[in-house]
Amino acid sequence: MHFSVRLSLFLTLASSLPLVSAVPQHEDQAYTFSSSGRSAATDTDPALEVRQETQRTPSAWTRLRDSLVESVWGLPQRSEGCESRPRNRAKTVSRAPATLQARYGEDVVLRFTIKNQEEVKALVEASNILFLDVWGSHDDWVDIRLSRDVIPSLLGLLPPSLQTSHVPLIRDLAQTIYESYPKAGSASPSQQGPTTRRFSPSASTSKSKPHETKNIFFQDYQPLSVLLPWMRLLVSMFSSHTTLISVGTTAEGRDIPALRVGVHPTNNAQQAPRRRTIVISGGTHAREWISVSTVSYIAYSFITGYGKSKSITKLLEQFDYVFIPTVNPDGYAYTFSTDRLWRKNRQQTSLSFCPGIDLDHSWGYEWDGNATRSNPCSESYAGDQPFEAVEAREIASWARNEVTVNNVHFVAFVDLHSYSQQILYPYGHSCAHLPANLENLEELGAGLAKAIRKSSRENYDVKAACRGIVASCTGDKDADEPATSSALESTAGSALDWFFHDLDVRFSYQIKLRDRGSYGFLLPREHIVPTGKEIYRAMVAMGKFLVSPHVLEEDIDGLRASEEPQDYDNDLEDGEDDKDEQGSTVFRAQADDLQS
């Protein structure tokens, strides 16, 4: 077609189209709260408005115009072997579905800055009166989830200093929750349940660094329907030193699966010595997904590291490791199918509309459920008696049986939680009761924190558990006994204290994982591998300490660059990475088959 004819057609088309003018958006408004009413201004995100604009269906004129332009002018040919420059398009964002909007649409998470014990006490009392969900706390802050409509009531119960000392941590809880679900398949409760969830590499897998794509399992949070086959696959591939066991049965009848990893003498004539065992658990609170992924990461690293990493091989010859990815399978499954922020188990209580018991408050040592006995709706409900929670009772029975029947000596217990980056040691129920081996607990705790810091530069505080869930104040932080009224939640009846006191596990810790910043329990999937790496490094340091305490410091300081977590199997010695390729390739191929 002659150029003049093309130009005439184009000008004719252009003259018939409506004029559109670009109007700049107003400046972003601040998101503030007032004790006298709802939010003073709704949060306006210009970038979001642009993204929403790009998602609108093009008009008939626009489609006709584009079609004519393409037919008249043609499209530029793409060069062989290289990509054309991508168009400058705004990134589209999928919005949270109606089911999530209905459940969480009016909820936000506020972070309060705490300056003294009086403020702590006032915040605790107000939270109890309004039945608020206290997410977490650290030395000088407390995070609380609540509905926007409740904000005026909360601020009205607080002293003037707290009415202005807060900021929104999560402004759009429904959207943040929606984005936390696995990307592959369906992971949101608005679509299909966890039983039909299939895992596959994320869209960005091909662009990731090589050491970050060795196992697609850790590219996202995995539901129970993927976790269990993955554990079976590990056992089938590494049966020489890995077995799948059950440590109990849940309230809904599910097994509580665990991986036992260790190398035992092959000489049957030789009497087996008492086996030293380390338990690493996660998922006690269902919504703390990062704890499940981290236990799985450590288990995978230990299992695949045997025979290739000198450190791991030595540790597995010295100890058995029992990895329990989720102590609370019922609750964990429920977070994928129904309520992402569910905390307790799914056991029936005296109130049919308030099911669930807090597993970490149901253990027998220093159980004190009086504070929540009359309120099964409380997030910290401990039941009406010790060990009323089925899962806590089952795991305690398994542990006792291991000691009395199977000649097991538990030497360490590590319970992973989130969030706030803290390493906590006994006791949790009271700061007045000091452990007999306090110095050893503090020494190893400091070693774990240092190993993490050397691995990822992340800082984890080391303190007694009784201080870990108490918002510290500007007074004497080393006082022997913090005011009991300042406890943000009950600390009695914890697994940490029970294993330490009743089972005599001398090195018991609760580690609160990432982060301290903006995500709370909704840590993005990009943090799965970094968190796993740093805690894996800490568990290697713990094993070395238990083998020979005096070498811990020099081991951490003397880590060679090749041993830092730059590779996926991050404890490999020089020259050992290549030896892992064949075995890891076979395992990855089997894992790929699992999704089909």
Curated annotation (Swiss-Prot):
Keywords linked to the UniProt accession: Cell wall biogenesis/degradation, Disulfide bond, Glycoprotein, Metal-binding, Secreted, Signal, Vacuole, Zinc
Annotated binding of Zn(2+), by residue: 285, 288, 417
Leader sequence residues: 1-22
Ligand binding (substrate): 285-288, 343, 360-361, 418-419
Entries under Gene3D superfamilies matching the protein: Zn peptidases
GO terms classed as biological process: cell wall organization; proteolysis
PROSITE patterns xrefs: PEPTIDASE_M14
Residues carrying sugar: 370
GO CC annotations, alphabetized: extracellular region; vacuole
Subcellular location, principal: other
Physiological role: Inactive carboxypeptidase that may play a role in cell wall organization and biogenesis.
Protein name as annotated: Inactive metallocarboxypeptidase ECM14
Lineage start: Eukaryota, Fungi, Dikarya, Ascomycota, Pezizomycotina
